[in-house]
Curated annotation (Swiss-Prot):
It comes from Gloeobacter violaceus (strain ATCC 29082 / PCC 7421). Keywords: Cytoplasm, DNA-binding. Gene3D superfamilies: Nucleoid-associated protein YbaB-like domain. Its main location: cytoplasm. It comes from the Bacteria. This is Nucleoid-associated protein glr3498. GO terms for cellular component: bacterial nucleoid; cytosol. Homodimer.
Length: 111
């Protein structure tokens, strides 16, 4: 049976695509690690930076915020982190869709 015809051809094409995805995922991990994604809160008083693979890489707090209560600072930190995390997750998802051509991966096989 020639390649591309019937179940065997479909299986071979699927295996080829899986191999391409595996090869691309290592490159994608490096690309994501190099990204810097910033979340902000309080009009820029607090900034949290994550890599594209969601590793925290920095926190900036405007000195004027330090006169506020502990609870205000904590709330703004959490809000900025959530903003960065959401942006990072969206970036990761978009890049995975590029890599997989929109093919849905089973749970646990994505990032």
């Amino acid at each position: 049976m020639s390649k591309g015809f019937g179940p065997m051809g479909q299986f071979q094409e699927a295996l080829k695509r899986v191999k391409q995805i595996q090869e691309g995922s290592a490159k994608l991990q490096d690309e994501l690690a190099a990204l810097s994604i910033e979340g902000v809160a309080g009009g820029g008083l607090v900034k949290v930076t994550l890599s594209g693979n969601q590793e925290p890489t920095g926190v900036t707090i405007d000195p004027q915020l330090l006169s506020e209560s502990k609870e205000v600072v904590e709330d703004l930190l959490l809000t900025a982190y959530k903003d960065a995390y959401t942006k990072s997750a969206e970036t990761m998802k978009a890049k995975m869709q590029e890599l997989t051509g929109g093919m849905e991966l089973p749970p646990g096989l994505g990032f």
